[in-house]
Amino acid sequence: MTREAWIIDAVRSPRGKGKENGALHNVHPQRILAQVLNALRDRVGFDTAEVDDVVMGCGAGSGDHSMDIARMAALDAGWSLDAPGVTLNRFCGSGQQAVMFAAQ
């Protein structure tokens, strides 16, 4: 584990499942987040084995968003099994809280 926290980039997913007839309604949130994680990996070009932690903000931590979606999405994306994950919920401030937590 490194002694310094490095935030190398930030990404976000579409809003979510949305309306019942919406394009993403039948896509599991974990799968959406896995695609975001892989897009980040591809854009920055890093080895997921070097990731010390996966920190995500999620304002709706129930139902299919539960069970630590950050960790589950990292596993779904095929990232290293060694990186833990944490999901933070501050409702509208979840993303900002995740960035501040990761920087500590």
Predicted regions and their residues:
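Conserved catalytic cysteine-centered active-site region
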Residues: C58-Q104
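Conserved active-site "lid/cap" helical segment
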Residues: M1-A77
